[in-house]
From Swiss-Prot:
It comes from the Bacteria. It holds the Pfam family Methyltransf_4. This is tRNA (guanine-N(7)-)-methyltransferase. Substrate binds at residues 101, 133, 165-168. The active site is at residue 97. Keywords: Methyltransferase, S-adenosyl-L-methionine, Transferase, tRNA processing. GO terms for molecular function: tRNA (guanine(46)-N7)-methyltransferase activity.
Amino acid sequence: MLCYVNYKRVKRPVEIPNLEVEIGFGRGDFIVKLAKENPDKNFFGIEISQISIEKLMKRVGKKGLKNVYCTNVDAYWGFYFLFRDNYVENIYMNYPDPWFKKRHHKRRLTKPERLYMFAKKLKLGGEIRIRTDNYEFLEFTKESAKVLDCFEVEEGTLNVKEPLTKYEQKWLSMGKTLYKLILRKVKEPKFVEHPEVEEVRELFPVKVKVESVDPKKIESREIKLDEEVYFKTFKVWQRDKDFLVECLLSEKGYLQKFFIQIKRKEDGYVIDVSPYSEVLRTRNLQRSIQTVAQLLS
């Protein structure tokens, strides 16, 4: 398996033994250090920044590391799609965004439904190890852990001889207090309502019997398909009698950007996801195709 794991294409759940995961690896200093010091283990980085992904891949290639993997996706969905329950040995979160404003707390990495997903995938005895410079974030995380009732909690201030990153080194040199929180899984978490998407084996094109296509009917539309499920269209391109529609689907926070093609056939048009769009096949993606067909009918 290559360093970069395309979660939409790879066989899931992944089969990578002795696996530890870092969420939000940034420059990649920590995950590379772990991989070099522990050649008998495998390390998986999950990161939403494409630039960070590319930088890590270059570093891994230059150092010849064979035990580092990464993917470009939101951490919750990375765990949801890629790992089976009780599989990951340890999870690392180094200075996650604390999202200071109260109205943004729902974006925090350790809100209960996200922490629930991480706990489900963590082995019994495994640990979620968090470093933060924000004490309020630490307290928030402890409250989320209480909801799940599956962790032994250990906390304290950091006193490190070897900083993980240049930022940690800078903060320590400034005398800033840094905190650590270890959540050790001792039993299965209590159930918490959490986002899910329904995958399907295949997507089916939809045929509409119309003489012509009016782009204004489908351009710049926003349609609610279900609770917390929204389908948006943007620009429409035309080439001869065929069309290409720029689209976005948001399912419980899981985002997919793709194109829908509208191709002329003898007695109408066939609507399908463009073969150049890489998508995760979901029930709501099929509904998106059907929605475009309805707009044209």
